[in-house]
């Protein structure tokens, strides 16, 4: 058993994380963490992950956004994009697909390290499971 996206986001550490789409899916379960930074990265998803990205995959690989949306597999808990990294603006197509599938699309501050964020997710998942 994991923790819901909504419960995780209610933890103080996540106060500057903002849900921009998929609000109806805040009850989705998180059991772990994954990253999406390379074109084949979506193949490694096994479900119920909170997927993090800097946005590099969408900014630097021409056509990947379309491919991602066409092959969208709604098994992950949510997607978190680091603000101010590679995307000036979250693509409208991404917002639409997350809203349509009721999967939270979340933005996070630029400053926290991946290790710090992953540790906080793990704390939330483990504390909720105990």
PLM features: what roles do these ranges have?
Residues 1-130:
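Alpha-helical/coil-rich non-catalytic "connector" segments in signaling and regulatory proteins
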């Amino acid at each position: 058993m994991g923790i819901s996206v909504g419960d995780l986001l209610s933890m103080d550490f996540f106060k500057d994380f903002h849900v921009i789409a998929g609000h109806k899916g805040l009850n989705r379960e998180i059991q772990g963490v994954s990253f999406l930074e390379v074109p084949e990265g979506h193949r490694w998803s096994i479900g119920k992950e909170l997927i993090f990205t800097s946005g590099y995959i969408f900014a630097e690989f021409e056509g990947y956004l379309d491919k991602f949306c066409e092959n969208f597999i709604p098994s992950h808990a949510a997607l978190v994009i680091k603000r101010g990294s590679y995307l000036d603006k979250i693509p409208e197509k991404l917002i639409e697909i997350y809203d349509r599938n009721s999967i939270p699309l979340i933005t996070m501050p630029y400053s926290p390290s991946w290790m710090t964020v992953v540790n906080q997710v793990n704390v939330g998942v483990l504390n909720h499971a105990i």
